[in-house]
Amino acid sequence: MPTNNTPFLTIFLLFLGLLRFDSFPGLEAATGKLASIPGLYVFGDSLVDAGNNNYLPISISKANYPHNGVDFPNKKPTGRFCNGKNAADAIAEKFGLPLPPPYLSLRGLLKREKRKSAAVTGVNFASGGAGIFNSSDQKLGQAIPLSKQVNNWLSIHEEVMKLEPSAAQLHLSKSLFTVVIGSNDLFDYFGSFKLRRQSNPQQYTQLMADKLKEQLKRIHDSGARRFLIIGVAQIGCTPGKRAKNSTLHECDEGANMWCSLYNEALVKMLQQLKQELQGSITYTYFDNYKSLHDIISNPARYGFADVTSACCGNGELNADLPCLPLAKLCSDRTKHLFWDRYGHPTEAAARTIVDLMLTDDTHYSSPITLTQLVST
């Protein structure tokens, strides 16, 4: 049912779609003259989960307890697998948007107005433990796989479509849809003899790319046009993997090889998808594998002193146990690349990675940079 707020929101969206942040004095240096985006919608796993798993009663993949959130405003553990804000938050801040709230926090009659507002500026659908395949949530008890995250987006999409049609279309075409997923599917493959018997690494990673393609099409069909797709990082270099890999604490290159295979399949899939959709989709693929490799190879260049151990944990490389309330906490989180044994980045690392996304060259981004993407 239309409300009295509809005309205002229509004008507001049209305004956002045409506005550039460099129109505001003093914001130029902070944003690097970024073009504005009206909304940020986030899909993925624990790398960008803002607290959706807090609302899943039987999920064991949660971060709503200390030391998580030790550097978040008010030192609040929000459900982010991080000491502070994650990469999705950093992207929102770069574009001057509010932090996208977790989708599950917007349910219920008392949250109706908050839901309407979030539908305009962005929502976070990501879930710790989620994967591209629907089966990825079985190991951790409960998560929201990508297909269900897209279902949740479609319910938010209904709120957007209550606006005047041209404003809704403009909003969808100018917003940024960010996807960060795939690591848990690979972890499942490493740990499952059944999966390895059913398919070789090339077949499995190609199937991952094919299934992701199906979900990207669903989002595109709803009116989305701009996508930021983030590849899988070197999960063989997480503190947990290093701690198990001999006394030298080297990366697990076998695991890294599978990450490379998936990223190669992902890049080819995105190229094919653009052709199939006759150019109606515009995307930036960010090579997170390469960015993490460069940070680990030259940590001082990026401001880090420790790129092997976890900031929060216990034991060898602080990676024998998860980040629990009684875990050992590093004193300077700004110097650590990894927050915990699973390889979640610290807030400092997340911000560094987002800065690399926003560089003007294509060393990490293809076929265009993120700054070019939001200017199209």
From Swiss-Prot:
Name the record gives this protein: GDSL esterase/lipase At5g55050
Superkingdom of the organism of origin: Eukaryota
Active site: 46, 340, 344
Subcellular location: Secreted
Gene source species: Arabidopsis thaliana
Residues annotated as signal peptide: 1-29
Major enzyme class: hydrolase
One GO cellular component, as annotated: extracellular region
Chief location of this protein within or outside the cell: secreted
Family as reported in the entry's similarity comment: Belongs to the 'GDSL' lipolytic enzyme family.
Statement: the UniProt record of this protein carries the keyword Cell membrane: no
Residues with attached carbohydrate: 134, 245
UniProt entry tagged with the keyword Lipoprotein: no
Pfam families: Lipase_GDSL
Gene Ontology BP annotations: lipid catabolic process
Gene3D superfamilies per UniProt: SGNH hydrolase
Gene Ontology MF term list: lipase activity
Entry EC no(s): 3.1.1.-
Keywords noted in UniProt: Glycoprotein, Hydrolase, Lipid degradation, Lipid metabolism, Secreted, Signal
